UniProtKB/Swiss-Prot annotation:
It comes from Mycolicibacterium smegmatis (strain MKD8). Keywords: Chaperone, Cytoplasm. This is ESX-1 secretion-associated protein EspG1. Part of the ESX-1 / type VII specialized secretion system (T7SS), which exports several proteins including EsxA and EsxB. Specific chaperone for cognate PE/PPE proteins, plays an important role in preventing aggregation of PE/PPE dimers. Also plays a role in DNA conjugation, in at least recipient strain. The gene is espG1. DNA conjugation in M.smegmatis is unidirectional with distinct donor and recipient strains; mc(2)155 is a donor strain while MKD8 is a recipient strain. Mutations in a donor strain that alter DNA transfer do not always alter DNA transfer in a recipient strain.
Amino acid sequence: MTAPFTAETGDAHIDDVVGVEVTIDGMLVIADKLGLTDFPPSMGIRLNIPQPDLRKVVWEQVERDLSAQGVLDVYGNPHPEVAAMVDTLARADRTLECRWWRRDAGGKMIRFVVCRKGGRHVVAARDNDLLVLQRVAPQIGLAGMVMTVLGEGSPANVEPLTGVADRLAQCRTAEELTGYGIPPTSARAYASIISEPDGWVEIVANERHPGGTTSQVDVAAGVLDAKQGRIVSIPRRVNGELYGSFLSGTKDNLERALEGLVEFLPSKTWFDKTDADNAYQH
């Protein structure tokens, strides 16, 4: 195994490579060469061949495939931009971990993350054994990063709905929802979206501390898509009690949902101040 990858990845980009597509085995080979072992848990990236001899044979073939793909150079070293993206994924300062259940695609689950290390941002998505990593600009905002995977969506025509999370979670019918002071049309739309979504996303946030320990929030933001449109959910804590708010799924409201989620982290922010200053200079 080579020495751990320590190049600074928070500032200027190395070249015009903005994304890479690899298998899980390919990611494990790249990570091994960079001395990286930990990835966001939701991505499920872990050693899958326990026998060292068999793993050596498989990885040798994977290395040949990665070299043909241009991910590894003639010396077997990862492309610098690929190395920087993998390093961001493995050593992120902040992470949004997302699980996207797609009823409209046979019930499959797509896992994806938004990661920040310094001023660098990477979106990584997993579909079965295929991983796609993409570098993104911080200027597009957290909602823009999440929407690189989810797509724009059509915002549902609903009024905001807020209530104590535990009680709101028990509501299933329009009649129950009208008790929260929203118009019957919005209540019917919410009831239909909640009962028959085409897909839904659960999003949690993590923060990495100096020394390598991490904190994860104990609440989640959400996105639901249905034929009536998209809605987003925002967690809030008021006087120690957890509230949930549902809003039409516009990009601005998704940004509010993600910012509200990040406020549950110990730092209460996606950027450290110096990182924010650096990120928006590029």
